[in-house]
């Protein structure tokens, strides 16, 4: 699997951090630079119908050798999260023997007391950061795994397969990855995002998601003469957040539990703004959370009638479970592929979202498969090489098993 490691180390050198403040697609030039390099690589590999559009969506096809087999797709994203992502310098810990891992030359440490999952990888080769950037396994590991699986299929033409479509997207990390996805040139019956975490993850449920902005306008006067006239919006903002349920936050929830998350807060005496994200798996509970926020805004407005309190709610994405359940064979095929690759499937909900969630509602059912990575979006991100190899083996098995499926 030297090609897999080489690919991944090459990919993470591309600076592809997306930019939520830029409405263009892609939101950063680095994503287009990376996409052009991947386009050239796909053409050199011999893939057909390789197409890169002006928005940075890259699609290609590995033609099948079984005419009656269903065409499927594999999808990954090219951007990285809103965290330091320039000049990524990975380090490789060969045959990890346990204990803390020093990241680079500074004081950053991948501590086993904090990341107990490290004990699962004794004797394996871990790819980490140098402590100054993220790694970019989310989702450059997925891209490397997809193309390495295709390399294997090209080298083993006796493996039965239907048409295999590849789709690489920009701006997934800022929630726009599916906005302009070219379904007209991606004729797969169903697809899989390769954008999950640890070895064995298989996901077909995700959060319902919304964002909420609470804007509070007060009245600023000289503090020496403020009695009876000043309305400090920051005081009201603090009161508003203090009334939110403290046990329903990201740091206090897991599994199928939803939450409110105060992502950003800013203010002056005159005006304060609170930005929340709202998450829940259950449709009714999700609706109740949005209703609860409306009630709290109305309650604070009654308590402070001279202030102006406004709420803006925006739905982001929905739980894809309802779109996958009529097609559960695609989950069972993925599960069988993992078992064929000696991987124990871990079926769990995604406490987040993927391009696949949006695409599932656009008519392309799209569960999520593991990449092998841990601690995405930060300097403690790492991925075991052996987990990446298992991802490749799973994808090859998935293509083979799907070739025999007839619905």
From Swiss-Prot:
The keyword Electron transport does not apply. One of its GO terms (cellular component) is cytosol. Its main location: cytoplasm. The active site is at 79, 172 (proton acceptor). The keyword Hydrolase applies. PROSITE patterns: ARGE_DAPE_CPG2_1, ARGE_DAPE_CPG2_2. Keywords: Aminopeptidase, Cytoplasm, Hydrolase, Metal-binding, Metalloprotease, Protease, Zinc. Cleaves the N-terminal amino acid of tripeptides. Belongs to the peptidase M20B family. This is Peptidase T.
């Amino acid at each position: 699997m030297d090609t897999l490691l080489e690919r991944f180390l090459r990919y993470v050198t591309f600076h592809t951090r997306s930019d939520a403040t830029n409405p263009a697609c892609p939101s950063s030039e680095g994503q287009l630079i990376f996409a052009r390099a991947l386009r050239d690589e796909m053409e050199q590999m011999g893939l057909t119908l390789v197409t890169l559009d002006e928005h940075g969506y890259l699609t290609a096809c590995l033609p099948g050798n079984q005419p009656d087999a269903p065409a499927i797709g594999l999808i990954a994203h090219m951007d990285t999260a809103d965290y330091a992502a320039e000049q990524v310098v990975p380090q490789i810990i060969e045959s990890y023997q346990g204990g803390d891992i020093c990241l680079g030359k500074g004081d950053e440490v991948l501590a086993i007391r904090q990341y107990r999952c490290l004990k699962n990888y004794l004797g394996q080769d871990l790819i980490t950061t140098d402590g100054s950037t993220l790694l970019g396994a989310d989702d450059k590991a997925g891209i490397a795994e997809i193309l390495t699986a295709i390399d294997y299929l090209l080298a083993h033409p006796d493996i039965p397969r239907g048409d295999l479509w590849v789709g690489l997207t920009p701006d997934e990390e800022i929630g726009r990855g599916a906005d302009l996805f070219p379904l007209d040139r991606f004729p797969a019956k169903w697809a899989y995002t390769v954008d999950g975490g640890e070895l064995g993850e298989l996901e077909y449920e995700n959060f319902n998601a919304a964002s909420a902005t609470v804007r509070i306008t007060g009245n600023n006067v000289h503090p020496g003469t403020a009695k009876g006239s000043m309305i400090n919006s920051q005081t009201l903002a603090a009161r508003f957040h203090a009334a939110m349920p403290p046990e329903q936050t990201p740091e206090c929830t897991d599994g199928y539990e939803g939450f409110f998350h105060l992502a950003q807060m800013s203010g002056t005496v005159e005006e304060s703004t609170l930005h929340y994200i709202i998450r829940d798996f259950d449709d009714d509970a999700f609706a109740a959370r949005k209703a609860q926020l409306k009630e709290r805004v109305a309650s604070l407005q009654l308590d402070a009638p001279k202030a102006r309190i406004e709420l803006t709610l925006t739905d982001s994405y929905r739980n894809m479970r309802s779109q996958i359940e009529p097609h559960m064979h695609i989950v069972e095929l993925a599960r069988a592929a993992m078992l064929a690759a000696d991987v124990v499937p871990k079926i769990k909900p995604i406490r987040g979202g993927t391009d696949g969630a949006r695409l599932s509602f656009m008519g392309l059912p799209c569960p999520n498969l593991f990449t092998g990575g841990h601690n995405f979006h930060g300097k403690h991100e790492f991925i075991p090489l052996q987990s990446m190899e298992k991802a490749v083996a799973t994808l090859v098995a998935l293509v083979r098993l799907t070739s025999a499926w007839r619905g």
